[in-house]
From Swiss-Prot:
Purpose of the protein: Guanine nucleotide-binding proteins (G proteins) are involved as modulators or transducers in various transmembrane signaling systems. Promotes transcription of 3',5'-cyclic phosphodiesterases pde-1 and pde-5, leading to reduced cGMP levels in sensory neurons. This causes suppression of insulin production and signaling which leads to increased daf-16 activity and contributes to increased adult lifespan and resistance to oxidative stress. In addition, by reducing cGMP levels, inhibits TGF-beta signaling pathways.
Name of the protein: Guanine nucleotide-binding protein alpha-3 subunit
Signal sequence, start to end: none
Chain spans, region G5 motif: 324-329
Region: G4 motif, residue numbers: 266-273
Subunit structure: G proteins are composed of 3 units; alpha, beta and gamma. The alpha chain contains the guanine nucleotide binding site.
Entry keywords, A to Z: GTP-binding, Lipoprotein, Magnesium, Metal-binding, Myristate, Nucleotide-binding, Palmitate, Transducer
One of the record's GO molecular function terms: G-protein beta/gamma-subunit complex binding
UniProt source species: Caenorhabditis briggsae
Gene symbol of the encoding locus: gpa-3
Length: 354
């Protein structure tokens, strides 16, 4: 009788196998959904990285979305010149041609012209182009780190011949460089290598940060983006605080947060193209007075990497670092592919499936 399995035992065995099967199915399901959180201080390039993910993995932007971006490009173009004119005033600099004062006054009062505009107003475009060609304005733009000049200013102001055309449609590069403040949470979904990705971008300004941690403790990885080029710039919302130092403080708080102890941490040192140009003129000593190295890209970048790495209080946690240019689609694709492979592998290992 002891050799015979009772009906009750058989039923328990079948139930156990069913539970095991269900648990494995749940593991497989979890392994096939990866949540990524993009974090970083304001204007570091998070939204640009998210747009690149859409271009590379989510069929880009529809014709309707591109059309909607026109108003953003129009406003960014106008705001670029307004910020330069304000910078000119704060730096107490002047136009090369005094007649440009009339154009400046017109531009400063032109907001209403762009409301509901389907085509960039010709009169406004002419005024902006006249100002942009003025040597005084070009001199002010060369000092853009001393005031809040948008990094996209040269692109949009230099593209007015194209932007003012009646049939203008924003290019992918226009959309990548366009900026609107992120408030709340923006999500992009895509599939890669049979894995579903959900990527979240949240507001980077200080006022938005309280929304971060409690919502995202279950993410698989954090991509933290720091603008490496902003070592000599101050915050938009606090002009006494260095942007690089603020970014490092934020990175330290996220990296060592109890909510993210087991979360993979990936650091994008972004805007490396701007950093490469700026380092020729200005040393990183403006942010790091103790820096003793040469004023070169490689040494300066290595020092900043070491600074960020030193903020990690967990010796068992690896920070995966990449130098990036978020507006370069080819480079972003190569880095994202590498990052995503690493995340998929780590996720499968975490579920016991690798």
């Amino acid at each position: 009788m002891g050799l015979c399995q009772s009906a009750e035992d058989k039923e328990l065995t079948l139930k156990s196998k069913a539970i095991d099967k269900e648990m494995m199915a749940n593991h497989m399901s979890q392994a096939k959904v990866v949540k990524l959180l993009l974090l970083g201080a304001g204007e570091c390039g998070k939204s640009t990285v998210l747009k690149q993910m859409r271009i590379l993995h989510d069929h880009g932007f529809t014709a309707e979305e591109s059309e909607q971006q026109k108003s953003v490009v129009f406003n960014n173009t106008l705001q670029a010149m307004i910020s330069i004119l304000k910078g000119m005033e704060s730096l107490r600099m002047t136009f090369d041609k005094p007649i440009r004062e009339n154009d400046a006054k017109f531009v400063m009062e032109a907001h209403k012209m762009l409301q509901e505009a389907k085509v960039f107003p010709e009169e406004l475009a002419n005024a902006l182009q006249a100002l942009y060609s003025d040597k005084g304005i070009q001199t002010v733009m060369a000092k853009g780190n001393e005031f809040q000049m948008p990094e996209s200013a040269p692109h949009f102001l230099g593209s007015l011949d194209r932007i003012k055309l009646p049939d203008y449609t924003p290019t992918e590069q226009d959309i990548l460089l366009s900026r609107i403040k992120t408030t709340g949470i923006v999500e992009v979904k895509f599939q890669m290598k049979s894995v579903d990705f959900r990527v979240f971008d949240v507001g980077g300004q200080r006022s938005e940060r309280k929304k971060w941690i409690h919502c995202f403790e279950d993410v698989n990885a954090i991509i933290f983006i720091a603008a490496i080029s902003e070592y000599d710039q101050v915050l938009f919302e606090d002009e006494t605080t260095n942007r690089m130092i603020e970014s490092m403080r934020l990175f330290e708080s996220i990296c060592n947060s109890r909510w993210f102890i087991n979360t993979s941490m990936i650091l994008f040192l972004n805007k490396k193209d701007l950093f490469a140009e700026k380092i020729k003129r200005t040393s990183i000593k403006s942010a790091f007075p103790d820096y003793k190295g040469a004023q070169t890209y490689d040494e300066s970048c290595r020092y900043i990497e070491e600074k960020f790495d030193g903020l990690n209080a967990n010796p068992e946690k690896t920070i995966y670092m990449h130098q990036t240019c978020a507006t370069d689609t080819d480079q972003v694709q190569m880095i994202l592919d590498s990052v995503i492979d690493m995340i998929i592998q780590a996720n499968l290992q975490g579920c016991g499936l690798y």
